[in-house]
């Protein structure tokens, strides 16, 4: 059996390692996992098929797989104060798919946040499975504040009387009032589901309210702010446990990815530490430091700022460029972010009026407020003066910052 990585793959792998080491990563959904998580992702656990759940497998030889998955389930329950946890979903999208299947029948009505306001594809986007399987209606944000308007959400819910309300977003920078969502859901007898994929790490660290107190089902990814192996996680009340488990297997998936489940479990254990709590606090501090610099230099922030790990910047109104153009300018100097639609966007989704900036990855590398102030000034300088000479100068500043906070130094391929 071949024991060496193909040179066709190895070259790209080493280039990607170098890119991660030498760039400032500001994509809000990305992070740097620990060396332990990396090792588990590539462990012998990838060889094992384990359809079913601990103690109830359809394959033999699952004794040690059961030990790891059971530890992951218990850790997730304790970390988020959940009655039940399923750590098998391959992704956040599949976690959402299973949650819908547990609560709904096809064509049932759902109210969720619109994509342009900050929602996610799996919250009813027409060409996504959610949009053509269920009957979605949407709420957005207030046009003046660009924040959730709970009175307006209540009006929409009372009008459409959904079976399920989805709270949570992929590009919303303010605290979400889960208690208010629960009160609205109760007025029409609807279930409440929270997608906390972006904020799970902040919830674990205690710097964002925990939706488990109010929601019937909570879904999340295990990467992003949770800093784990890529995948999904479902947390719920005990009364929904059987339906959720059946919706995951055999409803949505076959064999679970046990190497990734081990990586998820490791990340959940890491997230249970005091060190991780400090990490979550630092994310919020860093986001506010970055936001302040951008605002002080004339950039307009959607919703007026941020309470969490991300910032949405309106580059169209302040700099007269699209999000796509801003993304390319920043990438040219080694700062990675993504173009993003903003509320009431007049640009097409491939161009957008905004960019989304996140602090989790560089906080993992050790950046604190001072470094993020420097990053903010570099961003402003690059977007206001994208001349070749200026961008070359700024690229050197990016390289210098990355060299001061190295990552994955001992990894060789």
UniProtKB/Swiss-Prot annotation:
EC number: 2.1.2.1
Site features described as Plays an important role in substrate specificity, chain residue numbers: 223
Disulfide pattern: none
Entry-annotated residues carrying N6-(pyridoxal phosphate)lysine: 224
Top-level taxon of the source organism: Bacteria
GO biological process, one term: glycine biosynthetic process from serine
Catalysis: reaction(s): (6R)-5,10-methylene-5,6,7,8-tetrahydrofolate + glycine + H2O = (6S)-5,6,7,8-tetrahydrofolate + L-serine
Obligatory cofactor(s): pyridoxal 5'-phosphate
Pfam families: SHMT
CDD domains named in the record: SHMT
UniProt keyword list: Amino-acid biosynthesis, Cytoplasm, One-carbon metabolism, Pyridoxal phosphate, Transferase
Residues involved in (6S)-5,6,7,8-tetrahydrofolate binding: 115, 119-121
Enzyme class: transferase
GO CC aspect terms: cytosol
Major localisation: cytoplasm
Subcellular location: Cytoplasm
Pathway connected to this protein: One-carbon metabolism; tetrahydrofolate interconversion; Amino-acid biosynthesis; glycine biosynthesis; glycine from L-serine: step 1/1
PANTHER family reported in the protein's UniProt record: SERINE HYDROXYMETHYLTRANSFERASE (PTHR11680), SERINE HYDROXYMETHYLTRANSFERASE 1 (PTHR11680:SF35)
Assembly: Homodimer.
Function as written in the Swiss-Prot or TrEMBL entry: Catalyzes the reversible interconversion of serine and glycine with tetrahydrofolate (THF) serving as the one-carbon carrier. This reaction serves as the major source of one-carbon groups required for the biosynthesis of purines, thymidylate, methionine, and other important biomolecules. Also exhibits THF-independent aldolase activity toward beta-hydroxyamino acids, producing glycine and aldehydes, via a retro-aldol mechanism.
Family stated for the protein in its record: Belongs to the SHMT family.
NCBIfam families tied to this protein: PRK00011.1
Protein name according to UniProt: Serine hydroxymethyltransferase
Species assigned in the record: Mycoplasma mycoides subsp. mycoides SC (strain CCUG 32753 / NCTC 10114 / PG1)
UniProt lineage: Bacteria, Bacillati, Mycoplasmatota, Mollicutes, Mycoplasmataceae
């Amino acid at each position: 059996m071949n024991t060496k990585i193909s040179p066709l793959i190895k070259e790209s792998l080493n280039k990607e390692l170098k890119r991660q080491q030498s760039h400032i990563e500001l994509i809000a959904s990305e992070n740097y996992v620990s060396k332990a998580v990396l090792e588990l992702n590539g462990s012998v656990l990838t060889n094992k098929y384990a359809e079913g759940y601990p103690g109830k497998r359809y394959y033999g030889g699952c004794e040690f797989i059961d030990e790891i998955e059971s530890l992951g389930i218990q850790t997730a329950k304790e970390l988020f104060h959940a009655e039940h946890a399923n750590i098998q979903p391959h992704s956040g999208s599949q976690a959402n798919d299973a949650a819908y299947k547990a609560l709904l029948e096809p064509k049932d009505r759902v109210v969720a946040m619109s994509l342009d306001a900050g929602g996610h594809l799996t919250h009813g986007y027409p060409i996504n499975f959610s949009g053509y399987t269920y009957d979605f209606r949407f709420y957005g944000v207030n046009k003046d504040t660009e924040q959730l308007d709970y009175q307006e959400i209540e009006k929409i819910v009372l009008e459409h009387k959904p079976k399920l309300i989805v709270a949570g977003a992929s590009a919303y920078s303010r605290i979400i009032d889960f208690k208010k969502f629960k009160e609205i859901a109760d007025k029409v007898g609807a279930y409440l589901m929270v997608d906390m994929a972006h904020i799970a790490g902040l919830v674990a660290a205690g710097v964002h309210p925990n939706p488990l107190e109010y929601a019937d089902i909570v879904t999340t990814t295990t990467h992003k702010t949770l800093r784990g192996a890529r995948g999904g996680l479902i947390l719920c009340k005990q009364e929904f446990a059987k339906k959720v488990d059946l919706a995951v297997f055999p409803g949505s998936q076959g064999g679970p990815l046990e190497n990734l489940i081990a990586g998820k479990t490791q990340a959940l254990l890491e997230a249970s530490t005091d060190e991780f709590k400090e990490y979550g606090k630092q994310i919020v501090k860093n986001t506010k430091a970055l936001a302040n610099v951008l605002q002080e230099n004339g950039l307009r922030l959607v919703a007026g700022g941020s309470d969490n790990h991300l910032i949405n910047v309106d580059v169209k109104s302040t700099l007269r460029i699209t999000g796509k153009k801003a993304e390319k300018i920043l990438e040219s100097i080694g700062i990675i972010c993504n173009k993003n639609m903003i509320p009431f966007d007049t640009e097409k989704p491939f161009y957008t009026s905004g960019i989304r900036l996140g602090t989790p990855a560089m906080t993992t590398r050790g950046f604190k407020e001072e470094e993020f102030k420097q990053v903010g000034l570099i961003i402003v300088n690059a977007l206001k003066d994208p001349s070749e000479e200026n961008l070359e100068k700024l690229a050197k500043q990016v390289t210098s910052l990355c060299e001061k906070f190295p990552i994955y130094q001992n990894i060789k391929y």
